[in-house]
Amino acid sequence: MKKVGIVMGSDSDLPILRKTMDTLASLDIPFECHVYSAHRTPEEARDFALNARKNGIGVLIAAAGMAAHLAGAIAANTTLPVIGLPCKGPCFDGMDALLSTVMMPSGIPVATVAVNGGVNAALLAAQILAVADEELAAKLEAKRASDAAAVLKKDAALQEELNK
């Protein structure tokens, strides 16, 4: 199975990415994770993207807050799918990161999830990999069924409480 390559602009994004890594691990998806900044370590970020395919990566997740140019910088250097994960920073409640991540020029796409949407970034990466992996597709279907069952269990508990 191809790996998911995860890169964050700062270790301050790590709490969000722990959810990403936990979700990938729960689906038995291999991954690697790095801290590379689009602004402070641009050569390392570029090299990571340029070498991702030959290093066994099938999809990339790039997380950053504030100016959040990392996903675009990664996407500019690979034709692998890139998922942008905007993270909340000290101002604007993450809107600056969201807009910086989602507003890409034509020809350099970045699929973008919600601000701090680490779980959905992992699930989107899994869905991309599952296009060519029936076993992974089955795991995703089982997860969806389990999630639905959990919601229905909560509804049943609520209905029982309301009908006392």
Predicted regions, residues:
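Glycine-rich phosphate-binding loop
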Residues: 48-86
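N-terminal beta-loop-helix "entrance" segment that forms/cooperates
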Residues: 33-54
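Glycine/charged-rich beta-loop-alpha catalytic/anionic-binding loops adjacent to active sites
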Residues: 2, 29-32, 79-80, 102-110
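C-terminal binding/interaction regions
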Residues: 8-15, 19-20, 95-164
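Short glycine/serine/threonine-rich phosphate/pyrophosphate-binding segments
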Residues: 13-17, 41-45, 64-73, 92-95, ...
